[in-house]
Amino acid sequence: MKKKYKKVVVGGTFDRLHLGHKALLRKAFEVGEIVYIGLTSDEMIKEKQYSERILPYEKRLLDLIKFLEVNKYRNYRIMKIHNAIGFTTKIKSLEAIVVSEETYKGAVLVNKAREELGLRPLDIVVIPIIRSRLGCKISSSLIRAGLIDPFGNPIRREEK
């Protein structure tokens, strides 16, 4: 089946790989022949909520590779990123960026940076936010806080 784009990019921390991350990655592979994955460096995540609980880069990288292998995704490149723009201005042949509704603003920033360098802006492919069984978005922050699991199920706390 012919893909819509030759080269697409997707980025994130991909901490405690959850249903939202998986939906984002699946969409990237659905629309792109080659998927460039920007994985945030440990330095970049220091300002995130519960940053002390974010898994180290190497562990997140291994978890990401495991997901890609289990799903038999082959045409990808994982690159460490140190800021929101990452390598998107260095690979001129990128055609699209895959984001969630929540991270759409990041795609706009990427396109602004590309346009400032005279590069073609990327088409923006947006997936909806994946909701937990509690009705809130599934996020690594909620998983790190111990409120939900990676599938969006609430974690029952022992009553004291």
Curated annotation (Swiss-Prot):
Protein name, as recorded? Phosphopantetheine adenylyltransferase
Q: Which keywords accompany this UniProt record?
A: ATP-binding, Coenzyme A biosynthesis, Cytoplasm, Nucleotide-binding, Nucleotidyltransferase, Transferase
An annotated GO cellular component of this protein is: cytoplasm
Question: Which species is this UniProt entry from?
Answer: Pyrococcus furiosus (strain ATCC 43587 / DSM 3638 / JCM 8422 / Vc1)
Pfam families from the UniProt entry = CTP_transf_like (PF01467)
Q: Does this entry carry the keyword Cytoplasm?
A: yes
Instruction: Show the PANTHER family listed in the entry.
Output: BIFUNCTIONAL COENZYME A SYNTHASE-RELATED, DEPHOSPHO-COA KINASE-RELATED
Q: Which pairs of positions does the record mark as disulfide bonds? A: none
Q: What Enzyme Commission number does this protein have? A: 2.7.7.3
Q: Which pathway does it take part in?
A: Cofactor biosynthesis; coenzyme A biosynthesis
Where located? Cytoplasm
Q: Which family does it belong to?
A: Belongs to the eukaryotic CoaD family.
**CDD domains tied to this protein:** PPAT_CoAS (cd02164)
Which Gene Ontology molecular-function terms are recorded? ATP binding; dephospho-CoA kinase activity; pantetheine-phosphate adenylyltransferase activity
InterPro entries per the UniProt record, alphabetical = CoaD_Thcocales, Cyt_trans-like, PPAT_arch, Rossmann-like_a/b/a_fold
The record's Gene3D superfamilies line, in alphabetical order, gives: HUPs
